[in-house]
Amino acid sequence: MSRVCELTGKRAMVGNNVSHAMNKTKRKFNANLVKKRFFLPEEDRWVTLKVCTSALKDINKKGISAVIKEAKAKGFLQK
């Protein structure tokens, strides 16, 4: 499975490693992803999602139901 947040769509970015001599080599900045189980009370079931830690902050703030509804509206979540 790819390194993409299922709720926000965040994925790896590309940048440079820069040495002291200012030599640049390509590198990847991966999203900070966590595989996490959430309980959906309205569906009375558990779902496992691969989410970034910024999405976890949104879930703590808004609740899992609201965040999943937003992700489906934006087209990130097909479940």
Curated annotation (Swiss-Prot):
InterPro entries with a match to the protein in the record: Bacterial_rp_bL28 (IPR050096), Ribosomal_bL28 (IPR026569), Ribosomal_bL28/bL31-like_sf (IPR034704), Ribosomal_bL28_bact-type (IPR001383), Ribosomal_bL28_sf (IPR037147)
GO CC terms: ribonucleoprotein complex; ribosome
UniProt KW keywords: Ribonucleoprotein, Ribosomal protein
Record-level GO BP terms: translation
Entry-linked SUPFAM superfamilies: L28p-like (SSF143800)
GO molecular function, one term: structural constituent of ribosome
Keyword match Ribonucleoprotein: yes
DNA damage among keywords: no
Matches recorded under Gene3D superfamilies: Ribosomal protein L28/L24 (2.30.170.40)
Family matches, as HAMAP family: Ribosomal_bL28
Family according to the record: Belongs to the bacterial ribosomal protein bL28 family.
PANTHER family with a match to the protein in the record: 50S RIBOSOMAL PROTEIN L28, LARGE RIBOSOMAL SUBUNIT PROTEIN BL28A
Protein name as catalogued: Large ribosomal subunit protein bL28
Species in which this protein is naturally found: Christiangramia forsetii (strain DSM 17595 / CGMCC 1.15422 / KT0803)
Native organism taxonomy: Bacteria, Pseudomonadati, Bacteroidota, Flavobacteriia, Flavobacteriales
Gene symbol of the encoding locus: rpmB
